[in-house]
Amino acid sequence: MYLVLLIAVILFIIVILMIFLISGLFYPEQEPALPISPPKKKCKTDTDCKDKGHHCVGGICTNMSCLDAIKYDIKDIKLDPNIRSCNYTPKFYKFSNTTADLQSPFGKTRIDDAELYDPHSGEDFCQRLCLDRKDCIGWEFDQYYAKTTGECYFYIDPHPALKSKNDAVLAIARKVS
């Protein structure tokens, strides 16, 4: 009697082991669960991002470079390869010593809007005028003689191509609130 019970238990264990063996052959091992990444902090302006070096880009706080942020904000933008850096400002990505090539599609959307004379600060004035226009994605200040004497140009093409030049400053509007 005990022998029959022992054989039954051994057969039961063998059947269970066979089930595990067969299921292991036919059902490949699942990938381990990915580690849960911390949620990205949502933002509307740079002041919402408390971490050092973080800026609000596309509604999330990130430490991506200014040029990468532009490419993220404005899809299909074509930047001149000579442009290697830019700066974040509260409403614009600002380049030093750059302008649009007048022959590019971006340059063809250049609108001559205002000629400035002292005592206005040219760049600040151009920036305010661009922010007042609904279609303005960028502005340029061509300086004449004094720091504040020059001309404002505005751009409305959504995919600008930037070209280097020594006597102008171009800024592209950021997509922040």
UniProtKB/Swiss-Prot annotation:
Disulfide bonds: none annotated. It is a single-pass membrane protein. Residues 25-166 are virion surface. Its main location: virion. Induction: Expressed in the early phase of the viral replicative cycle. The keyword Membrane applies. Keywords: Early protein, Host cell membrane, Host membrane, Membrane, Transmembrane, Transmembrane helix, Virion. The chain crosses the membrane at residues 8-24. It is found in: Virion membrane; Host cell membrane. The keyword Plastid does not apply. One of its GO terms (cellular component) is virion membrane. Residues 1-7 are intravirion. It comes from the Viruses. Belongs to the asfivirus envelope protein p22 family. This is Putative membrane protein 165. It comes from African swine fever virus (isolate Pig/Kenya/KEN-50/1950).
